[in-house]
């Protein structure tokens, strides 16, 4: 009897091709579409252009998934995780922004929704032997590796998964490039073959970000201060709307050199900036991260690199394991390492693990202004 795989179908080209590839590998494929956000239940009105559209993007995605399931002759079911997403992903996102950090919701969406609640339904209700997702990544024996297509590799977003979760997962796109996936879809004439990739917040979609956050956090305007001269150089609409290293959207004109964001003071509602004459305010060479989730059973401590944000080039590091799942990571001068973001550590193509950046240092001094 064929093994049953419950596949997360999003209505996009990646999961559509996954369904076909799993069929070709002899699996019995069951599609499961997740609905994790409700704009009306979640008070998502400001910045949400989808409200006024004739067809909700989420409903269009479901219609596309149904069409592909029909083309491939596989069953497709629908499941709602709206409350779970709010409790485990979105609430965390808002709380992080409130304390001045820059979170990455995709990481916790994977940890709690796609590979936890989704998996529970797949295994208990639909008797799955495995679950599958359209991520560009590779796993073997509970360990996680980068995908073939480095430009699309999503192992960064999966570094909070456990070995037990990974043992029950199939990533059919591990050894394909995005172009190859598109070609397969076009050759099969799948309904999603030319559909553009989704962007925006995981399961929420594209939003006008400043207006979107105002649904949940009141905007608190304040001063923009040059951290080197201590002079007021402008005003901002709320520190939560700016990220470390940001250069655009500051509305600071009339200066000989452009400014970039280097930090903030929440209590004083101050956004700190610097120009290229003072790069040290943007640089760091050490960090402390919390909640380290080790995936690799073994790794070479002399061959480690890391990403501090998605699609960043891997940077050589030195890793020190501390107590209470904390890690200390040292590296050469690097710009815009940001608390709240995830650091993912690699041994070559193998994912060693991931943790959330908590404190950042430069020349043994903690950067207290970020």
From Swiss-Prot:
Catalytic residues (positions): 109 (nucleophile), 202 (cysteine persulfide intermediate)
Subcellular location: Cytoplasm
Its EC number(s): 2.8.1.13
Signal peptide extent: none
Region (Interaction with tRNA): 152-154, 309-310
Residue numbers marked as site, Interaction with tRNA: 135, 341
CDD domains found in the cross-reference section: MnmA_TRMU-like
Primary localization class, coarse: cytoplasm
Cited InterPro entries: MnmA-like, MnmA-like_C, MnmA-like_central, MnmA-like_central_sf, Rossmann-like_a/b/a_fold
A GO MF term: ATP binding
Cysteine pairings via disulfide bonds: 109-202
Gene Ontology CC terms, in alphabetical order: cytoplasm
Region described as Interaction with target base in tRNA: 104-106
Pfam families in the cross-refs: tRNA_Me_trans, tRNA_Me_trans_C, tRNA_Me_trans_M
GO biological process, one term: tRNA wobble position uridine thiolation
Top-level class of the enzyme under EC nomenclature: transferase
Sites where the protein binds ATP: 8-15, 34, 134
Record keywords, A-Z: ATP-binding, Cytoplasm, Disulfide bond, Nucleotide-binding, RNA-binding, Transferase, tRNA processing, tRNA-binding
The reaction(s) this protein catalyses: S-sulfanyl-L-cysteinyl-[protein] + uridine(34) in tRNA + AH2 + ATP = 2-thiouridine(34) in tRNA + L-cysteinyl-[protein] + A + AMP + diphosphate + H(+)
HAMAP family on file: tRNA_thiouridyl_MnmA (MF_00144)
PANTHER family cross-referenced by the UniProt entry: MITOCHONDRIAL TRNA-SPECIFIC 2-THIOURIDYLASE 1, TRNA 5-METHYLAMINOMETHYL-2-THIOURIDYLATE -METHYLTRANSFERASE
Family note: Belongs to the MnmA/TRMU family.
Protein name as it appears in the record: tRNA-specific 2-thiouridylase MnmA
Gene this protein is translated from: mnmA
């Amino acid at each position: 009897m064929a093994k049953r795989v419950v596949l997360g179908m999003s209505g996009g080209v990646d999961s559509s091709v996954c369904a076909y590839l799993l069929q070709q590998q002899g699996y019995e494929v069951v599609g499961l579409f997740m609905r994790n956000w409700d704009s009306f239940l979640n008070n998502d009105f400001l910045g949400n252009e989808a409200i006024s559209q004739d067809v909700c993007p989420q409903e269009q995605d479901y219609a596309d998934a149904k069409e592909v399931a029909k083309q491939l002759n596989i069953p497709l079911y629908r499941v709602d995780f709206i409350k779970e997403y709010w409790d485990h992903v979105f609430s965390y996102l808002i709380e992080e922004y409130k304390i001045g950090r820059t979170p990455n919701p995709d990481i916790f969406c994977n940890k709690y929704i796609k590979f936890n609640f989704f998996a529970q339904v797949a295994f208990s209700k639909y008797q799955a032997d495995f679950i599958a997702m359209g991520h560009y990544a590779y796993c073997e024996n509970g360990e996680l590796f980068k995908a073939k297509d480095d430009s699309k590799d999503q192992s960064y977003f999966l570094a909070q998964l456990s070995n037990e979760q990974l043992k029950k997962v199939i990533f059919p796109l591990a050894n394909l490039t995005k172009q190859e996936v598109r070609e397969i879809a076009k050759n099969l004439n799948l309904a999603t073959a030319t559909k553009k990739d989704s962007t925006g917040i995981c399961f929420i979609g594209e939003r006008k970000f400043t207006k979107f956050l105002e649904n949940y956090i009141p905007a608190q305007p304040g001063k923009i201060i040059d951290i080197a001269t201590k002079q007021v150089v402008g005003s901002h609409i709320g520190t939560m709307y700016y990220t470390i290293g940001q250069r655009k959207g500051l509305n600071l004109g009339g200066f000989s050199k452009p400014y970039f964001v280097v930090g903030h003071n929440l209590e004083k509602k101050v956004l700190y900036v610097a120009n290229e004459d003072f790069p040290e305010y943007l640089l760091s060479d050490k960090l402390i991260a919390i909640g380290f989730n080790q995936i690799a059973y073994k790794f070479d401590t002399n061959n480690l690199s890391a990403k501090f944000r998605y699609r960043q080039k891997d940077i050589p590091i030195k890793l020190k394991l501390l107590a209470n799942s904390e890690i200390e990571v040292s590296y050469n001068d690097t710009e815009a390492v940001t608390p709240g973001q995830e650091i993912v550590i690699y041994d070559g193509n193998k994912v060693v693990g991931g943790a959330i950046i908590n404190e950042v240092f430069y020349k043994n001094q903690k950067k207290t202004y970020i």
